A protein has these predicted regions:
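Iron-associated oxidoreductase/ferritin-like identity signal
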Residues: 1-111
C-alpha cells in the first residue's frame, strides 16, 4: 500500500503514461497478429488490440475531466490537420502513397 495518494498533477501524468502503454500494447498485439497466419490467434489478438483502443478512450475522457482543457488541445490539433487536408489539391492527394500496398515481411519465423 502506498504511503500517500497521488497529487492531482501526478495522477494526470500517470494517466498520460497509461495512454502511452495502451498505444504500445496495440502496436505489439497488431504486430503479432500480422506475423501469424493462424486465424484464431489473429482474430483474438486484433480483438484484444481493439479493447486497448477502448481503454485509450476511457483514459482520454478522464484527462478531459481532470485537466478541464485537454479536449480543447485535441480539437485544435484535429482542426490543424483538417486545414492541411483542405489545402491539398486533388492532384497532391492522388500522388500520396497508398497505405497497405505490397506487404514487406520478415519471412518465416520457423527458418
Amino acid at each position: 500500500i502506498p504511503e500517500r495518494k497521488l497529487t492531482h498533477e501526478e495522477l494526470v501524468r500517470a494517466i498520460r503514461l497509461n495512454i502511452a502503454a495502451e498505444h504500445e500494447a496495440i502496436f505489439l498485439y497488431m504486430a503479432h497478429a500480422e506475423a501469424t497466419d493462424h486465424p484464431l490467434v489473429k482474430e483474438v489478438l486484433i480483438d484484444i488490440a481493439n479493447e486497448e483502443r477502448v481503454h485509450i478512450g476511457e483514459f482520454e475522457r478522464l484527462l478531459e475531466i481532470l485537466t478541464g482543457d485537454e479536449d480543447r488541445y485535441v480539437a485544435e490539433g484535429r482542426e490543424e490537420v483538417d486545414e492541411m487536408a483542405e489545402e491539398m489539391t486533388a492532384a497532391e492527394q492522388a500522388e500520396a502513397p497508398e497505405m497497405g500496398g505490397e506487404e514487406i515481411t520478415i519471412g518465416s519465423l520457423k527458418d
